[in-house]
Amino acid sequence: MENVPNVYFNPVFIEPTFKHSLLSVYKHRLIVLFEVFIVFILIYVFFRSELNMFFMPKRKIPDPIDRLRRANLACEDDKLMIYGLPWMTTQTSALSINSKPIVYKDCAKLLRSINGSQPVSLNDVLRR
């Protein structure tokens, strides 16, 4: 056999001499600001109504029973009557759930048991 020279490979390490400018924070401030701007735009687009509800004052919803607070109950014989409703000028019969007038044998005694000798307002009955 011929005499073949042996070749030996030695690892060579080259130390980088350039600086890693791509990893620098100072160079990419605008990119970070742009990303933050995009995030705020996306939050606004997808959560607009929630943000509006959070920052706007709550609307006060009127209580429908407030209109009935001035109404009073009275008895006419055994019939329960209601007067003082804002949309009615006369005394009308109080109606039950099935739209029939409420007739009770001892109507006056029932009203006295609720509020004594004071006039019985509809609010007194609704709070019980």
Swiss-Prot record:
Q: Which family does it belong to?
A: Belongs to the orthopoxvirus OPG099 family.
Q: Which GO terms describe its cellular component?
A: membrane; viral envelope; virion membrane
**A biological-process GO annotation:** fusion of virus membrane with host plasma membrane
Taxonomic placement: Viruses, Varidnaviria, Bamfordvirae, Nucleocytoviricota, Pokkesviricetes
Localization (cell): Virion membrane
Q: What does the annotation say about its assembly with partners?
A: Interacts with OPG086. Component of the entry fusion complex (EFC) composed of OPG053, OPG076, OPG086, OPG094, OPG095, OPG099, OPG107, OPG143, OPG104J5, OPG147 and OPG155. Except for OPG095 and OPG053, each of the EFC proteins is required for assembly or stability of the complex.
What upregulates it? Expressed in the late phase of the viral replicative cycle.
**Claim: Disulfide bond is one of the keywords in the record:** yes
Protein name, entry field: Entry-fusion complex protein OPG094
Keywords from the named record? Disulfide bond, Fusion of virus membrane with host cell membrane, Fusion of virus membrane with host membrane, Late protein, Membrane, Signal-anchor, Transmembrane, Transmembrane helix, Viral envelope protein, Viral penetration into host cytoplasm, Virion, Virus entry into host cell
Residues on the membrane's Virion surface side span 52-107
- Modification comment: Most cysteines are linked by disulfide bonds. They are created by the viral disulfide bond formation pathway, a poxvirus-specific redox pathway that operates on the cytoplasmic side of the MV membranes.
Q: Does the keyword Transmembrane helix apply?
A: yes
Superkingdom of this entry's organism?
Viruses
* Function summary: Component of the entry fusion complex (EFC), which consists of 11 proteins. During cell infection, this complex mediates entry of the virion core into the host cytoplasm by a two-step mechanism consisting of lipid mixing of the viral and cellular membranes and subsequent pore formation.
Membrane-spanning ranges: 31-51
Q: How does it sit in the membrane?
A: Single-pass type III membrane protein
InterPro entries, alphabetized: Poxvirus_L5
Q: According to the UniProt topology, which residue ranges lie Intravirion?
A: 1-30
Q: List the disulfide bonds.
A: C75-C107
| Chief subcellular location | virion
